[in-house]
């Protein structure tokens, strides 16, 4: 594999507007070939998406999804830049897909990691630091392990970091980036609420994630 220089990453960022990590991945996937990396980013819908992400998105749609049987319901607000895009089939399908994703992810509480309150991160850190498997490790090693575990745990709580139920090879964040590239507007998932019938009442649980994924697959067929 060719060595990927910072200069090459910078050049790719300037040409595509993609994020640094996306550029590094594109170059690694294409053995340092700049043109192939650009094409790879375009195929993934990442190129140019980052450039649009700073623009104001004040239009959009509040979408809903009720799972079969009425046991789980979701409301989600997804913003775009214009009413024209908000009324389009592709944007509305994106909103519905995101709502179905939320229904399938009972552990998700936030849109992105930056939305997680500091006290939750501190609580998770305290839990990890107290685990028995770290008791005999040096302090600096413990800190590194804990940082990695906390990062993983916080991502489990966020919508954008989840594997997309219709295509687990991409994340929800990548799905949104693809839509930004396709529709030519900034798109932001702003907030959501997930309702569960009888929440807080002790009862037998079923695999909602599998059910929603199956329903999504059926809708495509």
From Swiss-Prot:
Residues making up the signal peptide according to the UniProt record: none
Keywords from the UniProt entry: Cytoplasm, Elongation factor, Protein biosynthesis
Subcellular location: Cytoplasm
Alphabetical list of SUPFAM superfamilies matching this protein: Elongation factor Ts (EF-Ts), dimerisation domain (SSF54713), UBA-like (SSF46934)
Ranges for region Involved in Mg(2+) ion dislocation from EF-Tu: 82-85
InterPro entries, per database record: EF-Ts_dimer_sf, Transl_elong_EFTs/EF1B, Transl_elong_EFTs/EF1B_dimer, Transl_elong_Ts_CS, UBA-like_sf
UniProt xrefs under HAMAP family: EF_Ts (MF_00050)
Name of the protein this chain belongs to: Elongation factor Ts
Organism: Synechococcus elongatus (strain ATCC 33912 / PCC 7942 / FACHB-805)
Gene: tsf
């Amino acid at each position: 594999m060719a060595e990927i220089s910072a200069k090459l990453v910078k050049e790719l960022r300037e040409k595509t507007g993609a994020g640094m990590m996306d550029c590094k991945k594109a170059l690694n996937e294409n053995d340092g070939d700049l043109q192939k990396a650009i094409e790879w980013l375009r195929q993934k819908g990442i190129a140019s998406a980052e450039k649009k992400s700073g623009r104001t998105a004040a239009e959009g749609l509040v979408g809903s999804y009720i799972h079969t049987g009425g046991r789980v319901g979701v409301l989600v607000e997804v913003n775009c830049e214009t009413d024209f895009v908000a009324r389009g089939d592709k944007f509305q399908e994106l909103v519905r897909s995101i709502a179905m994703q939320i229904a399938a992810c009972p552990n998700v509480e936030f849109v992105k990691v930056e939305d997680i309150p500091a006290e939750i991160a501190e609580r998770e850190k305290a839990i990890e630091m107290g685990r028995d498997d770290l008791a005999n490790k040096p302090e600096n090693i413990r800190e590194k392990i804990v940082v990695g575990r906390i990062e993983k745990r916080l991502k489990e709580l966020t919508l954008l970091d989840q594997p997309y139920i219709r295509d687990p090879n991409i994340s929800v964040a990548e799905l949104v980036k693809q839509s930004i590239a396709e529709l030519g507007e900034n798109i932001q998932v702003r907030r959501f609420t997930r309702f569960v019938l009888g929440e807080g009442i002790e009862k037998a649980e079923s695999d909602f994630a599998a059910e929603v994924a199956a329903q999504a697959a059926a809708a495509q067929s």
